[in-house]
Amino acid sequence: MEHYISLFVRAVFIENMALAFFLGMCTFIAISKKVETAIGLGIAVIVVQTITVPANNLIYTYLLKSGALAWAGLPEVDLSFLGLLSYIGVIAAIVQILEMTLDKYVPSLYNALGVFLPLITVNCAIMGGTLFMVERDYNLGESVVYGMGSGLSWALAIALLAGIREKLKYSDVPDGLQGLGITFITIGLMSLGFMSFSGVQL
């Protein structure tokens, strides 16, 4: 249990998808203008990550990995070259289901997210979670914990940035830094703050 807790804490704070690896920056900057919308997208990313990382773990373990098809009498077959294609297919399917669900049950959030909801499919933070899982050879339990933690890390970062940007509207920002300029500086300062967790040994 201790191992899973440390993996979760490491995924959220020490290896933050947005502020340590700078993944998913396009959506991160574009949707962080309002806290409400940012939290909505953050929850969507958590859901997608929590489902896709374990799902891709099963596909990799039982179909793609070298020797994975031993159960089918094909121990020599290595389909790992199909990895990226398979992972993108799973991510696209999950995002499509999420999109249809939001359209039916939470149309206000669906409209607020606009084009950025289907763009979760190509959000490199989502793909990054799966690729880190494969690289680190996580088992199914670790994949579930890591998927949830990495999704939460991105959601936490975008919610924090949205809160700061809402406050910045009422600040006296120099003309040359208004808009994206001050946003990039803010992200840099947030990243420095999260760097303080890098010395924590779990």
Swiss-Prot record:
NCBIfam families: nqrE (TIGR01940). The keyword Cell membrane applies. It is found in: Cell inner membrane. This is Na(+)-translocating NADH-quinone reductase subunit E. The keyword Translocase applies. It is an enzyme of class 7 (translocase). GO terms for cellular component: Gram-negative-bacterium-type cell wall; plasma membrane. Belongs to the NqrDE/RnfAE family. Composed of six subunits; NqrA, NqrB, NqrC, NqrD, NqrE and NqrF. It catalyses: a ubiquinone + n Na(+)(in) + NADH + H(+) = a ubiquinol + n Na(+)(out) + NAD(+). GO terms for biological process: respiratory electron transport chain; sodium ion transport. Keywords: Cell inner membrane, Cell membrane, Ion transport, Membrane, NAD, Sodium, Sodium transport, Translocase, Transmembrane, Transmembrane helix, Transport, Ubiquinone. GO terms for molecular function: oxidoreductase activity, acting on NAD(P)H, quinone or similar compound as acceptor. The gene is nqrE. It is a multi-pass membrane protein. Its EC number is 7.2.1.1. It comes from the Bacteria. Its main location: membrane. NQR complex catalyzes the reduction of ubiquinone-1 to ubiquinol by two successive reactions, coupled with the transport of Na(+) ions from the cytoplasm to the periplasm. NqrA to NqrE are probably involved in the second step, the conversion of ubisemiquinone to ubiquinol.
